[in-house]
Amino acid sequence: MTVIKPDYEVLDALYDEVNKEFFQGQLPEVVLTVQRHKKAYGHFRPLAWDGDKHELNISANYFKGEPFEILVTLHHEAIHVHNFGVYGKVKDVVDNKRHNEKFRQACVDFDLYVVEDEQIGYVTPRLLEKQSECWQTWYAQMVEKYELGKYFNLRFPDLIGKGLLSTGKTW
C-alpha cells in the first residue's frame, strides 16, 4: 500500500500564494486539513478552530491527481473564506451543499469560471478563459517553486480553453 503524506507546510504556502495572487493578501490565516471525501475536492468550516480560525479541508482522494486541482480547490475554498469575512454569518451555500448567488458572484469577481448545476448549485470546474493563460504561467511557477511533482502525478495539460476538472466531482 502506498501512503501519501500531505506536506502541510506546502499546503500552507500554496494557500498563502492563492491569497496573495487573487485576494491581495487580505484573507486571514486558516487551518488546513486533509481528509478523505469521495464527493468533494474540499470544504470550508468557518471558525472551526478555537472559534477564531477557519478550516479549509482538501480531500486526500485528489493528492494523486493534478496539482492544478489542489490549486483551484484552494482558490475555491478561499472564496468561502472571503465571503464569510464580507457577509459574516450569511453563508454562500444553502444546507451546506448548494452554492448560492453570493458564491457565484464572488467566483466571477475572483476569476473562477462558474456553471450552474441543478442539484448542487454553482460549481467552479475551471478558471475563466480570460485568465487561463495567466493562470497557466502562475501554475507552472507554483509547480516548480514548491516541487509539486513529488506530491502529485503531473500531467500538466494545456489549460487554455480546455474543460478543466471535468471529473464530475464537486467542491
Which stretches of residues belong to each language-model region?
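A short, surface-exposed helix-loop junction/capping segment
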Residues: M1-T2, N83
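Active-site-adjacent structural patch at catalytic or cofactor/ligand-binding sites
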Residues: L56-A60, E77-I79
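A broadly used, surface-exposed interaction patch
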Residues: I58-V72
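Surface-exposed beta-strand edges and their flanking turn/coil or helix-capping segments
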Residues: R45-L47, I70-T73
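Metalloprotease/metallohydrolase-associated module, dominated by Zn2+-dependent proteases
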Residues: T2-D52, A60-K64, G88-W171
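Active-site recognition of the HExxH zinc-binding catalytic motif
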Residues: V72-G85
